[in-house]
Structure formats: C-alpha cells, structure tokens
C-alpha cells in the first residue's frame, strides 16, 4: 500500500511540475503579447497624430451645389 501511495504521490508531483511549466510558458507568451500590444498602440497613436496634422493642413472641400441644381 505504501508503494501505491508513493507512486500516486510521484504522479501528482509530476503533474504539478508540468502544470507549473505550462503556467510559466503561458505567462511568458502573455508578457510578449502585452509588449507587442503596447508597441502597436504607440504606432497607431503616432499615425493618428500624423493623420490629424495632415487633415488640419489640407484645404477643406469646396462648397458648391451639385450640377443638377
């Protein structure tokens, strides 16, 4: 019976070790994705700033009536 309990304990410890490794791996992926998301957010903000500057500098559309009026 002691051998059976030891075998079960060893199996549980092995599963726990694999789960710890999986959690660590997933955490690393999440951190990488967070960094990528932050980088992309900064790039989008830069592009929005540039677009707003271009829109402010561009002449507005002419206000004319359509030809059918």
Curated annotation (Swiss-Prot):
Disulfide bridge partners, by residue number: none
InterPro entries with a match to the protein in the record: SlyX (IPR007236)
Family to which this protein belongs: Belongs to the SlyX family.
Protein known as: Protein SlyX homolog
Source lineage: Bacteria, Pseudomonadati, Pseudomonadota, Alphaproteobacteria, Maricaulales
Pfam family, one: SlyX
């Amino acid at each position: 019976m002691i051998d059976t309990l030891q075998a079960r304990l060893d199996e549980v410890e092995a599963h726990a070790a694999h789960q710890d490794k999986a959690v660590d791996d997933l955490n690393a992926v999440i951190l990488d994705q967070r960094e990528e998301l932050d980088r992309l957010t900064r790039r989008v903000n830069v592009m929005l700033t540039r677009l707003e500057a271009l829109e402010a500098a561009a002449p507005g559309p002419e206000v004319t009536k359509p030809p059918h009026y």
